[in-house]
Amino acid sequence: SQNGNIEWLCFPDFDSPSIFASMLDREKGGAFGFEVSGDYRITQNYVPHTNILSTQFSSDEGEFVVLDYMPCYRSQDETGHYLPAELYRYIHWIKGKPRFKINYHPAPNYAQGQVILNITPQYIESYCSFDNKDRQYLYASLSLQDIKEKKEIILEKDEFLLLSYNEKVIPIDIEREKIEYCRTLVYWLNWTDRSKKYTLYNLSLIHISEPTRQAE
């Protein structure tokens, strides 16, 4: 949404059951976003020539940007693409001490059944009570307990959130997140550079012509 909330997401695939669906049901559909005071101004756009979404929050007390992207880049052997079922939310601190709460409310399997949330030192695991084969894992550089309890967070440096369909083998930290961001950014810049250019609506076409998220 325009305020940085994810209100519809089928996961891990495009035709999978939804895990966030507040666009259809505000009460129980599930969402993943940021809650700030009414003093904040929120603007949203895409990083030029990419499919990376930028949502900027600014007020007198501080400013930060949330960069949303799904990793996408050429594999090391150059025979295909690395396209994991993952969504990064890179929280880039700009100035001051901005405050917000994270609304992490997954509702797997179209919000049917009870949602089970398990918190571990590494992640928050979620799944549906009567269909637990599909699970989601939220990794973060912020306190997982604060996220689960929806406590106010004061941002003083860059942080990240990672929603993954799989448990991560490689430890995830902010430096790893920045590497994934840079790889994805370069991929999109190269992809758009090779694409046909149009006089009108060129940037809009980038966002509706995304390559399929399946390894080639």
PLM regions and their residue ranges:
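Terminal accessory carbohydrate-recognition/targeting modules of carbohydrate-active enzymes
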Residues: 1-205
